[in-house]
């Protein structure tokens, strides 16, 4: 089982990778860096068909105004996602909902101005809280 981190165009994974943990809530963290809107849509579609993915952290990056041309395909990819997702941004203008209006709304939207490591830490904290623990509970001998 894993948490998939999707980094969109202009999202710089180097700014959070040094502080990234190898896992969260007993799940491996898998990162996919997308160079454009088309690859972001393809990654969302692939995540929907991957039984290992339990939750998606979506850092859509700084999508250019031309990305709005792809709104229908991006919205369809989000709406088809069978898992919850958390949107995270370092700028409020990057939020997807105001122009995308997906039916499958994010579990949470995290916006931390100019502080990507904090956005990822908060998003992973939310993920850890929302996903059931994979660790066996400790039991006291009777």
Where on the chain are the PLM-derived regions?
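A short beta-strand-loop structural module common to alpha/beta enzyme folds
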Residues: 28-40
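Short, glycine-/small-residue-rich phosphate/pyrophosphate-handling segment
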Residues: 8-22, 94-142
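Structural motif
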Residues: 6-10, 35, 59-62
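Extreme N-terminal starter segment of soluble prokaryotic enzymes
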Residues: 1-4
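TIR-domain catalytic/interaction hotspot
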Residues: 40-49, 75
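A generic structural motif
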Residues: 24-31, 53-54
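Mid-chain, well-packed structural core segment of small domains
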Residues: 61-101
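Short acidic/histidine-rich motifs immediately flanking catalytic phosphotransfer sites
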Residues: 48-58
């Amino acid at each position: 089982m894993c948490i998939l981190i999707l980094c969109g165009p202009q999202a710089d994974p180097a700014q959070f990778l040094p502080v990234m943990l190898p896992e969260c809530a007993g799940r491996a963290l898998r990162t996919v860096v997308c160079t454009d809107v088309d690859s972001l849509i393809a990654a969302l579609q692939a995540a929907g068909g991957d039984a290992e993915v339990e939750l998606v952290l979506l850092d859509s990056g700084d999508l250019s105004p031309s990305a709005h041309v792809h709104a229908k395909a991006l919205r369809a990819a989000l709406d088809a996602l069978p898992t919850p997702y958390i949107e995270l941004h370092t700028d409020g203008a990057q939020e997807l909902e105001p122009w995308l209006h997906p039916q499958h709304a994010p579990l949470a939207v995290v916006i931390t101005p100019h502080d990507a490591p904090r956005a990822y830490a908060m998003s992973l904290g939310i993920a850890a809280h929302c996903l059931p623990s994979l660790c066996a509970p400790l039991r006291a001998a009777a």
